[in-house]
Amino acid sequence: MNLKQTRLHILHQAADLSKEAKTGVSLHCHTQHSKEMLDFVPHYAEKLPIISHFWKKERDRYREQKGKELDFATAFWLPPLVEQEVYDIEKKQINDSGLEAIVSITDHDCIEANLQISEQIGNEQPPISMEWTVPYLYGFFHVGVHNLPKTRAVEISKQLLDYTFGEERKSGELHDLFAMLNDIPEVLAVLNHPLWDIEMVGKERHKTLLDNFLSEYGKWIHAFEINGFRRWSENKAVIEMAESFGISLVTGGDRHGCKPNTVINLTASRTFGEFAEEIRVDKRSEIALMPEYRQPLKSRQLQSFAEILRFYPEHPAGRNRWFDRVHYDNGDGGGLRPLSAYSWRFANGPLWLQAAIWTLGFFGSPQMRPFFWLTMEAKDRVPKQSLFDGEKSRAANRSADDPLATDNSPLVTDN
């Protein structure tokens, strides 16, 4: 597969990237301000071995006691780290690679973390961004809206969120919102994880939804996302789709735990505005898959779950336990409250749930990764060497031990 607009670096060990670029750009990461919906819980809980048995018992017990079903439609959880911690972790990984860093935090439908970061490190001018939930027909999409103008960020984000959460949506309103974003040259609108059936409507219905969405709004989408928490086979399909549409590619790590993003963009730009022009106008992109991305996805997901669910003694009371960060409305009139406000105040929940959490932590440990390597499908194994530019003369000059080494069958080509 030879792409015209993208160069891809696949690193299998840490490397100095200062000869490849000036700046590393980390997109799509989440902080304590990001409300992560839990409406998927019943869907997956019924499919997980062992857990499904206890889940059904709890569900039936709740129905018997309350006379109604468990309702996760409004329930959400919050990632454990504050914005400064997330920013510092992302910045360090990029700096350790010999690059200047730009970090774009994208909490769900919220710019609070960005505003606070801007106050704390204003001299670095971090972009003000968010992951915007865009309702569409019978589903929704997530659009990374990066680098809102600081003087208008609150105003624009309110307009976007009024559309997301408003009871009535006017005809043509979404067109107007996308056009508004497109008219701001330094803003980047990214369709995050486009092939993921996140709305759980089924693969074919999601494809129909995506095709219709792109037909209507694709001209205002500046890039598709290669996502750090999606399978390689899916990301490869996104690369192919971007090529067919003539749309640029960017990365999005989508981190929620304590580890840095596993994918970043490389650029010669010094500011996010310059980077946005590179993507929007020049339509060229340079991407690095960090060594951690090559690790089995299921193992990385479980490790992230374990980080999300562990105890953080250094955090303030009311936020250091996982059940302080999970909010649920049990229908008693008290609205959404942390689980710790219910009967979990002095305990860690039912024993079966404690056991399930321990199991997640065990299987998410690095020691268990060999097991996941054995069960990993061939199509999801990331190539061992970088196949990023097709310049055979350049490849010939690289050592076999070079983490950026290429072979003669480039995955991505510069023309």
Can you annotate each of these PLM segments?
Residues 52-58, 67-79, 90-110, 188-190:
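Divalent metal-dependent hydrolysis catalytic cores, especially in the metallo-beta-lactamase
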Residues 99-100, 124, 185-188, 219-221:
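Loop/turn elements at helix/coil->beta-strand transitions in domains of secreted/extracellular proteins
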Residues 117-118, 174-190, 238-247:
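Surface-exposed amphipathic alpha-helices with a cationic face
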Residues 406-410, 415:
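Arg/Gly-rich low-complexity intrinsically disordered repeat tracts
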Residues 107-108, 192-195, 253-255:
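Short, well-ordered beta-to-alpha junction loops that form the rim of enzyme active sites
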Residues 1-62, 115-116, 120-125, 136-155, ...:
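Charged catalytic cores and adjacent phosphate/nucleic-acid-binding surfaces used
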Residues 82-94, 205-214:
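Short, acidic/polar
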Residues 141-188:
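Binuclear metal-dependent hydrolase catalytic cores centered on His/Asp/Glu-rich metal-binding motifs
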